[in-house]
């Protein structure tokens, strides 16, 4: 078919979605986060710029304390932004990501798959657990071995999600 007409149709569809306040990142399917390009869409929060500071502080803290093979827990992992950024920026670190929602964990897995294509060394060092971060048995096997816990849990009421500013 006519590629210009198809492109215009796609463009108008995207504009219509944006006019309905759908986040731009969900429309494009991508969200930049530090050095990563994460896949996002319905069912996962878009990583916020302030979350990049969580990663930066975690990297600086573990480095300052000589933890060059840090063991990290990323609670409420969502897209995987925090744990994947840490794993790719701190070689040798090991990350356990905890995500309660199976639907959201599908995005975590997609981003893990994409990230390991660029950073194959992290493949064995990133572990995704589908579990409730607030439950004591979650990650019991790691008791006493973790260097740092990083998290930016969801704090937006579900009723506010469709209209949150992007």
Name what the model sees in each region.
Residues 68-78:
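Conserved class I S-adenosyl-L-methionine
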Residues 61, 65-68, 140-144:
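Glycine-rich phosphate-binding loop signature in dinucleotide/nucleotide-binding domains
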Residues 79-92:
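Conserved SAM-binding loop of SAM-dependent methyltransferases across substrates and taxa
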Residues 92-93, 98-166:
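S-adenosylmethionine
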Residues 41-42, 78, 152:
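A secondary-structure boundary/capping signal
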Residues 1-61:
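Conserved AdoMet
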Residues 21, 51, 82, 108, ...:
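Residue-level signal for inorganic ion chemistry
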Residues 39, 85, 99:
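Conserved beta-strand segments that form the floor/walls of ligand-binding pockets within enzyme
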């Amino acid at each position: 078919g006519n590629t210009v007409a198809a492109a215009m149709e796609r463009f108008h569809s995207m504009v219509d979605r944006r006019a309905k306040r759908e986040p731009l990142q969900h429309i494009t399917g991508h969200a930049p986060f530090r050095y990563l390009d994460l896949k996002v869409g319905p069912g996962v929060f878009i990583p916020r710029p302030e979350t990049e500071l969580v990663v930066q502080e975690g990297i600086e803290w573990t480095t300052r304390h000589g933890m060059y093979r840090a063991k990290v827990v990323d609670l409420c992992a969502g897209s995987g932004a925090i744990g994947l950024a840490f794993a790719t920026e701190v070689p040798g670190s090991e990350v356990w990501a905890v995500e309660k929602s199976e639907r959201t964990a599908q995005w975590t897995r997609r981003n893990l798959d994409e990230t390991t294509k660029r950073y194959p060394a992290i493949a064995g060092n990133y572990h995704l657990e589908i579990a409730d971060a607030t439950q004591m048995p979650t990650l019991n096997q790691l008791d006493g071995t973790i260097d740092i816990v990083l998290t930016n849990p969801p704090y937006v009421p579900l009723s506010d999600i469709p209209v949150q500013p992007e």
